UniProtKB/Swiss-Prot annotation:
Leader sequence segment: none
Cellular component annotations (GO), alphabetically ordered: cytoplasm
Protein name (record): Argininosuccinate synthase
Coiled coil: none
SUPFAM superfamilies named in the record: Adenine nucleotide alpha hydrolases-like, Argininosuccinate synthetase, C-terminal domain
HAMAP family recorded: Arg_succ_synth_type1
Catalytic activity: L-citrulline + L-aspartate + ATP = 2-(N(omega)-L-arginino)succinate + AMP + diphosphate + H(+)
Any GO MF annotation of the entry: ATP binding
Pathway the protein contributes to: Amino-acid biosynthesis; L-arginine biosynthesis; L-arginine from L-ornithine and carbamoyl phosphate: step 2/3
GO biological process, one term: L-arginine biosynthetic process
Annotated EC: 6.3.4.5
Length: 417
C-alpha cells in the first residue's frame, strides 16, 4: 500500500532531523524534506544529503535569496517596517515564503500534509499554520515539536537510538534564526532582561566600542523605493543587502536589544542584528522625506505601523496585508535618488540626500537674498488657519483660562540708565 506523503520544512538541525523519523513512526508518512537558503549561508548540499540520510524519501534544496529579497524584504523596506518601532521582522518575513514553497511542492508531489519544526510557544507556529491554511486549506498541518512533548534530553536519546547525527553546536545556550535581513537570538542568559547580552550573542556586528575610529561614508541609490547600488556599483538586491551587512556590521551598526510582545501573549527578550536593514531603512526614510508630499508623508506611518503588526502576526496572505501593501507601493513611484550615510560606532547617520523628484525648493526654503517665498501671503494664511480657534474662543471663552490660572507677576519697569 502506498504511503501518504508529507512535506517538511527542513533546516538540518536536530529538531527537524528527529521530525523526519518521528513522522514516519507516528503517522507512517513518506517524508519529503525542503530546505531553503534565504541568506543564512546554508551548505545546501550537506543539508540535502543529511535529509536523505535520516530517512526522507526526497530532499529539495532551494536557493531562495533573490526571491526572498525581491518579494518579501523589499515591500518591508518600502514600508519601513519595524514591529513596535524596533524589530525589522527578520524571521516574520521568511515564514510566508517558506510556507508558499512548501505548499507548491506539496501540490506538485501529491502530498496530503505539510509540517514545520516550531514549538508551541513561539510566533512562528502561527505564521506557518495561518499561511498554510490561506494557501491551501485542504492540506493537513503537523507540528512534531509541538506534538511530541519530548524534553531536550529525550529528544537526544531518540536521535541516538535512531542513528540521527547530533549537531556539534547543540550545547549552545542560544536559539538563533538568520536570513539576509538579519539575525535573531534568544534563550540562555538573554532571557534575563536585566543582563547585558554577552559578546558571543552577536555575530554579524562588531561591538561599537571596538569599531573603527574612522567613519565610513557610503552612497545608496534607490529607484522607486528599491536600493539598486552602493557607491555607484549596481547589484541584485540580495547581494546588495548581504554586502551592506558586512559594510555596516564592521561599524557595529544594527544591534537591537528588544523586549517585545509576542503574538501568543507573552513578552520575550530578543537580541537582533540587522546592519543592512537598519542602514537601508534610515536611508529610505530620509529619501521619502525629500520626495513625498506632506500629506502622504504624515499618513504613511499609520499604514506602516498596521502593516508591521499584520506581518508579525502571520497575516502576510490576508486581504488587509494586500490592501496595505497596495498603498505602500503607490507611494514609492517618485522615491528615487541617492542618500549619503555615515557609518560610525553603531550609528548609521544620513548626512546627505538628492533626487530628481525632490520637493525641496531651495529658493523657497532659503533665508538669503534669493528667497522667493511670498511673505505677504503668510498673513492671510495665518488668519484663515487660526479662524476656527478664534471663533471657538469668541463663543466659549479663551482656552487659556481653562488650563492656566492667572497669576500675579512682579513687573519691573525697564529704565534706561
Amino acid at each position: 500500500m502506498t504511503k501518504e506523503k508529507i512535506v517538511l520544512a527542513y533546516s538540518g538541525g536536530l529538531d527537524t532531523s528527529v521530525a523526519v523519523k518521528w513522522l514516519q513512526d507516528k503517522y507512517n508518512y513518506d517524508v519529503i524534506a525542503v530546505a531553503l537558503d534565504v541568506g543564512e549561508g546554508k551548505d545546501l548540499d550537506f543539508v540535502k544529503k543529511k535529509a536523505l540520510d535520516v530517512g526522507a524519501i526526497k530532499s529539495y534544496v532551494i536557493d531562495a535569496k533573490n526571491l526572498f529579497a525581491e518579494e518579501y524584504v523589499l515591500p518591508a523596506l518600502q514600508a519601513n517596517l519595524l514591529y513596535e518601532g524596533k524589530y525589522p521582522l527578520i524571521s516574520a518575513l521568511s515564514r510566508p515564503l517558506i510556507s508558499k514553497i512548501l505548499v507548491d511542492i506539496a501540490e506538485e508531489e501529491g502530498a496530503v500534509a505539510v509540517a514545520h519544526g516550531c514549538t508551541g510557544k513561539g510566533n512562528d507556529q502561527v505564521r506557518f499554520d495561518v499561511s498554510f491554511t490561506a494557501l491551501n486549506p485542504n492540506l493537513k498541518i503537523v507540528a512534531p515539536v509541538r506534538e511530541w512533548a519530548m524534553s531536550r534530553e529525550e529528544e537526544i536519546e531518540y536521535a541516538k537510538s535512531h542513528g540521527i547525527p547530533i549537531p556539534i553546536n547543540l550545547d549552545s545556550p542560544y536559539s538563533i534564526d538568520q536570513n539576509l535581513w538579519g539575525r535573531s537570538n534568544e534563550c540562555g542568559i538573554l532571557e534575563d532582561p536585566w543582563a547585558e547580552a554577552p559578546k558571543d550573542a552577536y555575530d554579524l556586528t562588531i561591538d561599537p566600542v571596538d569599531a573603527p575610529e574612522d567613519p565610513e561614508v557610503i552612497q545608496i541609490t534607490f529607484k522607486k523605493g528599491k536600493p539598486v547600488s552602493i557607491d555607484g556599483k549596481e547589484m541584485p538586491l540580495d547581494e546588495l543587502i548581504l554586502q551592506l551587512n558586512t559594510i555596516a556590521g564592521k561599524h557595529g551598526v544594527g544591534r537591537i536589544d528588544h523586549v517585545e510582545n509576542r503574538l501568543v501573549g507573552i513578552k520575550s527578550r530578543e537580541i537582533y542584528e540587522a546592519p543592512a536593514a537598519t542602514t537601508l531603512i534610515a536611508a529610505h526614510q530620509e529619501l521619502e522625506a525629500l520626495t513625498l508630499p506632506r500629506e502622504v508623508a504624515e499618513f504613511k506611518p499609520t499604514i506602516e505601523q498596521k502593516l508591521a503588526q499584520t506581518v508579525y502576526y502571520g497575516l502576510w496572505y490576508s486581504p488587509l496585508t494586500e490592501a496595505l501593501q497596495s498603498f505602500i507601493e503607490k507611494t514609492q513611484e517618485h522615491v528615487s535618488g541617492t542618500v549619503k550615510v555615515k557609518l560610525y560606532k553603531g550609528h548609521a547617520q544620513v548626512i546627505g540626500r538628492e533626487s530628481e523628484n525632490s520637493l525641496y525648493d531651495f529658493d523657497l526654503a532659503t533665508y538669503n537674498k534669493a528667497d522667493a517665498f511670498d511673505h505677504d501671503a503668510a498673513l492671510g494664511f495665518i488668519k484663515l488657519w487660526g479662524l476656527p480657534t478664534q471663533v471657538h474662543s469668541a463663543v466659549n471663552g479663551p482656552q487659556g483660562k481653562k488650563s492656566i490660572e492667572k497669576v500675579d507677576l512682579e513687573v519691573k519697569e525697564a529704565v534706561k540708565p
